[in-house]
């Protein structure tokens, strides 16, 4: 019985290695729950925001934030997660990330955080 179990274990491990080891993954747009916009930025400092939200399960991992500068004072931020296939814990997983916006011109900036379902969260950033 032990030898059958040992052979089964070896075959299972070998098949995982032969298949590449990593399950398939894809990128998806995720929505955020809130965005904290600190104050005190000037045109000589790099501006940033802190976003937070919930992943639907443990297969989601933060990947990146795509920033589109629509014009000088309007910016659209899209949060991207990587979802891997496989066994996942079906629990909400909180996340918090800093998003670097770079140096911005003096004035009132509109930040639009786009979600995957067409909705967005809008915040204002004042650069002195």
Model-flagged regions — what are they?
Residues 4-14:
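Sec-dependent N-terminal signal peptides
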Residues 19-70, 75, 119-128:
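Primarily secretory-pathway and cell-envelope proteins
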Residues 46, 106-108:
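Extracellular Ig-like/FN3 beta-sandwich strand-entry sites
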Residues 71, 103-105, 117:
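Short loop/turn positions at the edges of beta-strands in beta-sheet-rich folds
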Residues 78-103:
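An anionic, turn-rich surface loop/hairpin at beta-sheet edges
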Residues 83-87, 116-123:
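Short acidic/polar inter-strand loop motif in beta-rich domains
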Residues 109-113:
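A short tyrosine-centered beta-strand micro-motif
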């Amino acid at each position: 019985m032990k030898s059958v179990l040992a052979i089964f274990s070896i075959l299972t491990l070998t098949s995982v290695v032969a298949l590449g080891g990593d399950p398939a993954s894809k990128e998806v747009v995720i929505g955020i729950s809130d965005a904290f916009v600190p104050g005190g930025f000037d045109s000589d400092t790099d501006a940033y925001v802190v976003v937070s939200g919930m992943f639907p399960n443990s297969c989601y991992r933060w990947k990146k934030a795509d920033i589109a500068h629509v014009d000088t004072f309007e910016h659209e931020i899209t949060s991207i997660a990587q979802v891997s296939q496989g066994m996942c814990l079906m629990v909400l997983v909180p996340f918090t990330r800093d998003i670097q916006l770079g140096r911005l011109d003096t004035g009132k900036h509109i930040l639009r955080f786009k979600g995957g379902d067409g909705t967005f969260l809008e915040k204002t950033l004042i650069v002195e």
